[in-house]
Every structure is written in structure tokens, then in C-alpha cells.
Amino acid sequence: MASGEHSPGSGAARRPLHSAQAVDVASASNFRAFELLHLHLDLRAEFGPPGPGAGSRGLSGTAVLDLRCLEPEGAAELRLDSHPCLEVTAAALRRERPGSEEPPAEPVSFYTQPFSHYGQALCVSFPQPCRAAERLQVLLTYRVGEGPGVCWLAPEQTAGKKKPFVYTQGQAVLNRAFFPCFDTPAVKYKYSALIEVPDGFTAVMSASTWEKRGPNKFFFQMCQPIPSYLIALAIGDLVSAEVGPRSRVWAEPCLIDAAKEEYNGVIEEFLATGEKLFGPYVWGRYDLLFMPPSFPFGGMENPCLTFVTPCLLAGDRSLADVIIHEISHSWFGNLVTNANWGEFWLNEGFTMYAQRRISTILFGAAYTCLEAATGRALLRQHMDITGEENPLNKLRVKIEPGVDPDDTYNETPYEKGFCFVSYLAHLVGDQDQFDSFLKAYVHEFKFRSILADDFLDFYLEYFPELKKKRVDIIPGFEFDRWLNTPGWPPYLPDLSPGDSLMKPAEELAQLWAAEELDMKAIEAVAISPWKTYQLVYFLDKILQKSPLPPGNVKKLGDTYPSISNARNAELRLRWGQIVLKNDHQEDFWKVKEFLHNQGKQKYTLPLYHAMMGGSEVAQTLAKETFASTASQLHSNVVNYVQQIVAPKGS
């Protein structure tokens, strides 16, 4: 349903929201002046050389916006978010005329206005102002080539190395460089698209329906309203395989068998557990697209079609639970959304909590607490580096005009957000009751965008006895302090159920750090039943104790080939870091191979830091590896690695 149209049974007289008054300093648009009922994209993709000029790679076509004027006084222009890389060549306006079936679209004037380094305003002028509640249609003809929202990959950046690939990444404010829009999470709308591709290519989108129309055209429709940042497109040499009653995997042909094997049958279990906890899964399908190895992120929760790194193909299903995080966004983030990027914790803190609830049910409390302990360690690391008092270490971040919301991204909304949701559950004191509350919260605010105030008002209404106790102003734990004071969370959930997994890992790491190895004691510990996060925890402890006494790392690798020869990316990263910290040169080739196989930022940068902080041989390895892999990395990652390998001024 478009924003403003409410389905029966979803609290028909819906509460007024604090978010209705909220500003979004990251949008140049006049999104409060219009309701966006529908967007249609009709685009043709061309794979040519990069750069301007005839025949260069690009997407070209039209964007059609169906709008209703919300201004009581009417409006004389529409202002949209756009970007200098988006070349708009024509604008037309179609207005309702009494008795006319479909009035013709008439050309209208338009101009751009500077806004910030990440976008500009596109202003469409109406010859006569539109009236309050009037419906109108704006048609924009445009082309986009090189830019931050549309990522073009050469064949060598893909897994198959044969054909080029293109994908879009919208979060947080990049879709204004893909199509002109209200680029704010405050606005939700339905969309459709018709995408024309060259021979031998397939298009996929974050949409509820995917339909082939002729040999080279694909039609998509999203039946639920979503914010602009969740519209996503990918075009490449793609095939699919069913892995569940409402799920399929998409990948390049050379990856499809591995993807099917890894995810066959498991996604449905995650979805069904989420539905039991948080209510119906409203998006119809849940498909996964395995991106080319140069995709710099772990996952992006585009509805109906999550984009994920091929690093999740571990060969032993050990990283399948990473998908639980993206699935949890189906309720928290995609269904109930932060109204601006300063409230990002509403998307991510709740998603971390939901992920860990699903994980507790499927894998047990000990395992989930161990995973949460690794998350807490990341938060500690982040706060140690930035300083606790850094204003980014608040849940409610004040984003100043001109600041790209992406530049405020860090662990705080995830892990401090998780702690706040855990604290609210702790106040309730009963897990079943809090689960029921979360289901009610999703139902209350589905398809809407909210602020923390909307959520907290609802929480205190739902639990009147807590409201009566004034739990919002308990000294040291005030809701206001949680939101607006930087620093370490005032409350930490108890992770002691994880001790049964953490203690043995710590004790084993201690044995391996000894000058004289006690192989009898070491061999008495069977690590074959350990799950991934227990091994990760063990390797993190080894890394902290490194460099180990001479010969110990070689012996460690020989004793546990399942670690030193792992296919699992989380283990490969840590084994690489250990090898470099201990200058264990006979395994340096494994570091090089891992960096040749993938380009995920989270794995790539720490290994370059470790190489440049290591021996001369390690530093040479860094320079050689970068020289031979730079062409297959994402441009942002190239810039970051460049700064590590050859810092400016060195």
C-alpha cells in the first residue's frame, strides 16, 4: 500500500507519528509536499567502455512518478534528489483533466541546484501550480554512466571472468545517482520496472515479481511500499536454483552449484522462526543473489532479493547464520524503518536483537552469546579507537547538513542498539512477553518510518505498569541518556551462557602460547565439534598472544588442517593474520590466494594492515598482491588499500 493508504486491521485510526515532523538533512527534495504513489523505471543497459562518449556503458530511459499534492496551498514545483552523474534530458507533466481518459504529457522546464558533495536537487517547474490533493504524473528522460550509485564491473572483477556485470547499491543516499527520487527513508512507495539488457544477460531486482518479456526484457513489480534506498538492480551472466518453497539462489553459473548446496533447505527454517517471533513475512519471496567476489559488503537487505558476498559459500554451511541478520531486516528496517539516518539504530539495533533471538532458538543460548561476545569486542575496539566521547557513539546521531550519512557508519547503532533493546527486554523481565511486544510493534508500525520517540511511546503504552514505575528516568539508565549520551552502553546483557564455549577456547589458546608445547594436553581437546564462532574466538585469542614461540604456528597449522586449510572466509582471515603476525612465511601464499579470491572490505583491509605491519617479506607481498588484484577490486576498496600500502606523504 502506498503511504497514506492503510489496510484494514492495521490500527485503522493510526496514531500520529513524531516522524511526520522530522527533518532529513540528507535530502534536497520537497518530499513533504507530495505523496509518491508509484514509480516506474523503463531502462536500457549498455555495456561499453567506461567514460563519456558514444557507446560507453550506461543505463538510459525514463522514470515516471505518480504523485498527489499534499500542500494545502498547492505547489508550483517538484524538487527531487539527483546527482551530477545523472543526465536528465527531458521532463514532461501529465495532469488529471475531467472527462479525459489519459491526458497527453506536456514538456515542462527543469533545472538543477547544488546541494552537497553527494548529490544535487532536480527541480521540475509546473506551468500552473497543482492544487491540493491533485494527482499528477512526472516523466523524466535520463541517462547515468559512471557514478557512485551504479557499479560497473569488468569481466575480470566477476567470478566467471567472461562477461561484465553491473549492480546498484542504494544505502544510504546513493540511489539519487541511479534515478531521480525522494532519497529519504521517510518516504515509502511501490515501484515497477522494465529493464532491457544485451543478449546473454539476465536482470534481477528487489521486487516481488520477476517476469521475462521477450528475449532481452525483464519486468519487475514491488507490491509493498519501500523507501528509495531498497530499490536495487543487478545485471550479469546469472542463473538460479530453487532452495526452498519461497526461496531461490541467483549466481554466476560457476557459483550456482556451491550456492545451492550451501543454502538448500536452510533458508525456510530461518524465515519460519522469524515469522513465529515477529509476525508474517510480508515480502512473498526471499531470494539470495551471490555477488561477484569484488562486492565490498557482507550483505545488503534489498527486499525479496538480498545481495550477499560469495564469501558466504564456506562449503560447510558454517556461515549460513550470517543470512539470519539480513532475513531479520525483513521486519526491522524494511517493514519498520528509521525516518532519517540519524536514527539508524532503529534499523540495526533491532535487527541484531532479532538475529540473536532466531539464533538462540535454532542454535542455543551458548552459541548466540559467543557470537554476541565477538560483537561486543568489535564495539569495544571501535570505542577505543574513536574515544568513547565521540559524538558518533550515541544512538541518536546528529547528522549535520552536508555530511554524507555513510560517513557516520560504525558499530554503535548495531551493538549499542542491541544493548538498549536488551535493556528494554530486561525491564519487562519475561522473554515471551517481550517477544509478543516486538510482534505488536512490527504490526503497529509496518510500512511506516519512525523515530525513537514513536517506538518508546508505544513501549510505555504497551507496558503501563512500567510507565507507572517511570522506567524511562531510572538514574543512570534514562532513555534520554541511552539516546543522546555518547559512550559505553549503561547496561550489558549477560553473555555468561557462552562461557561453556569460550573457556575451552581460551584454555586451548593458552596451551599453544607456551614455550614448551604440552601436546598431550592439546590433543586431549577435540575441536572437530566446535562451531565457526568458537574457532574464531580461539583464533582471536591466538592472535592476541602472537607472536608465539618459534615453531608453534607451524605445529598449530599441522595439528589443525581444518583451520589452516579452511575455505571459510572468517577462518581464512584470522589464519592469514596469525601467519603474518608470526612471519610464518611458508603459508604466505594462502594470504595472497585469499586476496585474489575475494574483495570484501572487512577481510581485505585488515590483511593489508597486517602485511604492512609485518616483515619486509610481508610488505613486499602486500605490494605485489595489490598490483595484481587492484583491477578486480571495488573502487572504494582500491582507495583504502592504496592509503595502507603507499600512504600519502610517505
Curated annotation (Swiss-Prot):
SUPFAM superfamilies in alphabetical order: ARM repeat, Leukotriene A4 hydrolase N-terminal domain, Metalloproteases ('zincins'), catalytic domain
Entry EC number(s): 3.4.11.6
Principal cellular location given in the protein's record: secreted
PROSITE patterns: ZINC_PROTEASE
Record's catalysed reaction(s): Release of N-terminal Arg and Lys from oligopeptides when P1' is not Pro. Also acts on arylamides of Arg and Lys
Keyword match Iron: no
Subcellular locations according to the entry: Secreted
Any single GO CC term annotated in Swiss-Prot or TrEMBL for this entry: extracellular exosome
CDD domains: M1_LTA4H
GO molecular function ontology, one term from the record: zinc ion binding
GO biological process: proteolysis
Keywords: Acetylation, Aminopeptidase, Hydrolase, Metal-binding, Metalloprotease, Phosphoprotein, Protease, Secreted, Zinc
Record-marked site positions (Transition state stabilizer): 414
Biological role: Exopeptidase which selectively removes arginine and/or lysine residues from the N-terminus of several peptide substrates including Arg(0)-Leu-enkephalin, Arg(0)-Met-enkephalin and Arg(-1)-Lys(0)-somatostatin-14. Can hydrolyze leukotriene A4 (LTA-4) into leukotriene B4 (LTB-4).
Name of the protein in question: Aminopeptidase B
Species per Swiss-Prot/TrEMBL record: Homo sapiens (Human)
Designated gene of the protein: RNPEP
